[in-house]
Amino acid sequence: MANITAALVKELREKTGAGVMDAKKALVEVEGDMGKAIELLREKGMAKAAKKADRVAAEGLTGVYVDGNVAAIVEVNAETDFVAKNAQFVDLVNETAKVIAEGKPANNEEALALKTAAGDTLEAAYVNATATIGEKISFRRFALVEKADKQVFGAYQHNGGKIGVITVLEGENTDEALAKQLAMHVAAMNPSVLSYKELSEEFIHDELAQMNHKIEQDNESRAMVDKPALPLLKYGSKGQLTDEVVAQAEEDIKAELKAEGKPEKIWDKIIPGKMARFFLDNTKVDQQYTLLSQVYIMDDSKTVEAYMESVNGKVISFVRFEVGEGIEKAANDFENEVAATMAAALNK
C-alpha cells in the first residue's frame, strides 16, 4: 500500500480544489498515483455536478472585464447568496469574464469550450466548482460589447456584483468617469432600451393601458376625498407624437391662452414651457423604459439625452445584467428535496 503523505494530499488539493478527505481517499484508491487521483476526482466531480443539475441556481454574481476595445459582462449563478460570496466562486466569475473578453465566443457553448489560465476548459472549471463548493454553479449568460478607438467604456457593478453594467459613449468631452456615472444611472433606473424608437407599438399600447388603469384606480380614491380626477393619458411615447399631434397641441395651448385673456405678445414666452410640459406628460412610457428619456440621476434638471447634448456627447449603447432576472425561484426546493430523499429511503 502506498504511503499517502500530507504533502501529497496538499499537492492534490492545490491542483483540484478538493477537500482534505476527498483528496486523501482518491490517493488511497489509486495507490498514490497523482495523475490517476486527479482523473478520479474529476469523474466524481462530474457525478456530483450531474446530481445537482436539476436544482435552481438563482443567486450569484455578475462579472465585468474590459480588454482594450472589447468588454465582457457575464452572469454566473449559485444556489445561495452565501456561496456567491465564496472566494473560489468570485474568482471563477472574474476569470469567466476575462476569458470571454479575450476569446470572443459567439454563444455559451463556445464560451464553455474556452481555456482558463490553468489550461482546463471553462466547462471543466464549472464542474469542478460544483463538486468542491457543494452547490450547483452554472454559467448563465454573457454579452460582448465592442467600441471604436475614440469611444469610451463605462463599467460599474452595484451591490457587490448583483448588478453589472457596461456603457459606451462618444464625444470630445466624454471620458471613462462620465461613462461610469451613466453606468451607475443604468444600474439604478433599469432602462430596457436606449431610445423610444426601439419600443413596439404593441408594447406602448399595453403599457399605456396599464398606466391609465392605475390612474382610474387613483381617481376612485381621489373622489372619496373630493379631489379632482386626474386626466387619462392619450399618448405614452415620442413615437406617437406626430407632427400633426404636436401642431394640434400648440393650437390648443394658444386657444387656452386666448380664453384666459393672455396678451398675444407674451405667448411666445409661455408656449415653450407648456409644450415642454405636454411632452413630459405624454412620454411616460419612454421615461420608464428608455435610457435617453429618463431624468439623469446626476442632474435631475435634464434627461439623459439633454445632459449628453449639453456636453457634446452621445450614448452609443449599454448592457445591464441583474442576477436572477427571469429565473423562477422555487421556494419549496428544500422541502421537495427532503421529501424525495425520504421517499427513496422508504422504497429501498
Swiss-Prot record:
Listed name of the protein: Elongation factor Ts
Region span, Involved in Mg(2+) ion dislocation from EF-Tu: 80-83
Pfam families: EF_TS (PF00889)
Protein's organism: Streptococcus mutans serotype c (strain ATCC 700610 / UA159)
CDD domains named in the record: UBA_EF-Ts
Similarity section: Belongs to the EF-Ts family.
One Gene Ontology cellular component: cytoplasm
Gene: tsf
Keyword tags: Cytoplasm, Elongation factor, Protein biosynthesis
UniProt subcellular location: Cytoplasm
